[in-house]
C-alpha cells in the first residue's frame, strides 16, 4: 500500500505555487504538534477505556493526515476511529504504536517527495 496520496500533495503544491504563502510546511508543523499530544492522549483514553474519545482523537488526526496526503496514516486512524465507536475490546495499543511509527515514516517520505518535486521544477 502506498503511504502517500500524491494527487493530494500535487494539489497542495499547485495551490502553494499560485499563492504567495507557504502552505505545506505549516501544515506539517501543525501535524507534528498534534502528534506530540494526541498520541499520548490516545493512550491515556485507552487506559480509561474511553473509546469514544479515542475515536474522536483518531478522527481529528485522520483529517490532518488526509489534508497532507498521508494515506496510510489516515487508514490507521480510520480503523482506530471505527473500532473506538464500536466501543468493543480491540487491540488498540498495537495500532496506536503502528500509527506513531507510520506518522514518522510518512512525514519523512512526504519530505523526500517534496524535495524531489522541487528539484524537478527547478
Task: Locate the predicted segments by residue.
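Two-component system phosphorelay core
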Residues: 1-56, 60-62, 66-122
Amino acid at each position: 500500500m502506498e503511504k502517500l496520496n500524491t494527487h493530494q500533495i500535487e494539489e497542495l503544491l499547485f495551490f502553494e505555487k499560485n499563492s504567495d504563502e507557504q502552505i505545506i510546511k505549516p501544515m506539517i508543523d501543525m501535524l507534528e504538534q498534534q502528534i506530540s499530544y494526541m498520541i499520548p492522549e490516545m493512550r491515556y483514553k485507552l487506559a480509561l477505556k474511553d473509546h469514544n474519545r479515542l475515536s474522536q482523537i483518531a478522527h481529528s488526526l485522520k483529517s490532518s493526515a488526509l489534508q497532507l496526503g498521508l494515506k496510510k496514516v489516515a487508514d490507521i486512524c480510520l480503523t482506530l476511529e471505527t473500532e473506538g465507536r464500536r466501543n468493543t475490546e480491540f487491540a488498540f495499543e498495537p495500532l496506536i504504536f503502528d500509527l506513531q511509527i507510520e506518522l514518522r515514516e510518512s512525514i519523512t517520505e512526504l519530505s523526500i517527495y517534496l524535495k524531489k518535486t522541487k528539484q524537478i521544477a527547478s
